[in-house]
């Protein structure tokens, strides 16, 4: 439902170009939620790895403002990141050294991974529209 709502609202209010920019930049706060969890759960040892991951996803988001495949790849790479957190926090696993990644609320990793997959699939279907919008704006000299 969250992915369907995101698609419906974004298509209702954004042009194709602005939609790409929005979802590319939205990857940054999506990754940033893990910093909020780090603070909330007081996982002091997790700050370095979590902040590094946010920086990596921020690069994908910033590049994705202009390059559609960077948005797709960024959201797809976020899926295993969600899965590792869910597995470590709730399945008794330790895919990474325990305490190096933050805890997450029950089910958050599954929710986020599902959202990321559905949105990446949607972005794949929209990539040609996004490219066409950028080409048209360059041809016409418009910015948005």
Features from the language model and the residues they span:
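Functional transmembrane or membrane-interface alpha-helices that line membrane-embedded catalytic
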Residues: 1, 11-12, 20-28, 52-69, ...
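Catalytic glutamate of the conserved HExxH
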Residues: 75, 79, 83
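Short, conserved "active-site rim" segments that organize catalytic pockets and cofactor/ligand binding
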Residues: 8
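Hydrophobic core segments of alpha-helical transmembrane domains in multi-pass membrane proteins
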Residues: 49-55, 73-76
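Membrane-interface helix caps and helix-loop-helix hairpins in membrane proteins
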Residues: 13-18, 37-46, 65
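Membrane-helix boundary elements
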Residues: 25-43
């Amino acid at each position: 439902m969250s992915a369907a709502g995101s698609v419906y609202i974004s298509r209702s209010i954004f042009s194709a170009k602005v939609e790409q920019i929005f979802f590319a930049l939205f990857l940054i706060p999506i990754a940033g939620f893990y910093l909020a969890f780090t603070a909330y759960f007081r996982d002091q040892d997790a700050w370095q790895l979590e902040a590094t991951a946010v920086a990596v996803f921020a690069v994908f988001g910033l590049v994705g403002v202009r390059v559609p495949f960077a948005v797709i790849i960024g959201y797809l790479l976020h899926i295993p990141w969600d899965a590792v957190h869910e597995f470590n926090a709730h399945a008794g696993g330790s895919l990474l050294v325990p305490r190096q990644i933050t805890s997450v609320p029950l089910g958050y990793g599954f929710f986020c991974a599902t959202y990321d997959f559905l949105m990446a699939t949607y972005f794949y279907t929209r990539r040609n529209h996004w490219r066409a919008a950028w080409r048209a704006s360059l041809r016409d000299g418009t910015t948005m």
